[in-house]
UniProtKB/Swiss-Prot annotation:
InterPro entries: AP_complex_ssu, AP_mu_sigma_su, Longin-like_dom_sf. It is found in: Golgi apparatus, trans-Golgi network; Membrane, Coated pit. Keywords: Coated pit, Golgi apparatus, Membrane, Protein transport, Transport. One of its GO terms (biological process) is protein transport. GO terms for cellular component: AP-4 adaptor complex; clathrin-coated pit; trans-Golgi network. This is AP-4 complex subunit sigma. Subunit of novel type of clathrin- or non-clathrin-associated protein coat involved in targeting proteins from the trans-Golgi network (TGN) to the endosomal-lysosomal system. Adaptor protein complex 4 (AP-4) is a heterotetramer composed of two large adaptins (epsilon-type subunit and beta-type subunit), a medium adaptin (mu-type subunit) and a small adaptin (sigma-type subunit). Interacts with EHD2. The lineage of its organism: Eukaryota, Viridiplantae, Streptophyta, Embryophyta, Tracheophyta. The keyword Protein transport applies.
Length: 143
């Protein structure tokens, strides 16, 4: 397994979306998220987007007011994960039109659905924006 978890966090450190691909208790998740968020938010724009934490490599990127953080195994390619984050943001932009924190908050199920289309059991399985968004567009038409 490559990807262990994906977090979307605002500038104040509030988690807006969390998707885990390994089992952790709620207490372990809260502690892990708190540690990672503090570590990443304390860094400045000139520092590298890769951080080691516990037994994870954290790859993160800031888009507007949201930080996208992905925890991966040591042997995962950091640049590929940065590209994955960019693809996720582009996909959300295409659906929501310049995605922002409120889009995630009010359409959390769609954000999770996009992630579920892209990542299965910690492995990236879909990179086509059209294929990722197709089921969501069908659901939107049905409502």
């Amino acid at each position: 397994m490559g990807i262990r978890f994906i977090l979307m966090v605002n500038k104040q450190g509030q988690t807006r979306l969390a998707q885990y691909y390994e089992w952790l208790t709620l207490e372990e998740r809260r502690a892990l998220e708190g540690e990672i968020v503090r570590k990443c938010l304390a860094r400045n724009d000139q520092q590298c987007s890769f951080v080691e934490h516990r037994n994870y490599k954290i790859v993160y990127r800031r888009y507007a007011s949201l930080f996208f953080m992905v925890g991966v195994d040591d042997d995962e390619n950091e640049l590929a994960i940065l590209e994955f984050i960019h693809l996720l943001v582009e996909t959300m932009d295409k659906h929501f039109g310049n995605v922002c924190e409120l889009d995630i908050m009010f359409h959390l199920e769609k954000a999770h659905f996009m992630l579920e289309e892209m990542v299965m059991n910690g492995c990236i399985v879909e990179t086509s924006k059209a294929n990722i968004l197709s089921p969501i567009q069908l659901m939107d038409k049905a409502h």
